[in-house]
């Protein structure tokens, strides 16, 4: 068995309307760590910061994540405080989409995690697929 770079990895998201982009992130994350924790945003959290409810309820989104072979543990994400997640799960690396790279809040988080011996690894998003795009297509179909 090949040793992976990290012992515990962590990623989080809504994972609404699960698609190949989600699967790619989970696969890439698992390639880097022995144990992958996936935090799925609760319906309340999504409503709070996106001002809309997810299409798929939390329990079903968590069940989907739990059935994926790359995922070792599913937890609920009740807030967006990544340092509290670090304190709770003590991960070696956090996996994040590269659209956050360079954002001042994430630069600060990188520094905080580094001081604890953890880091952030950014992954490129899969082109031309997102839950938002899927939602738009479904709405167009519904209108026809």
Language-model features, listed with the residues they occupy:
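Nucleotidyltransferase catalytic core that binds NTPs
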Residues: 1-144
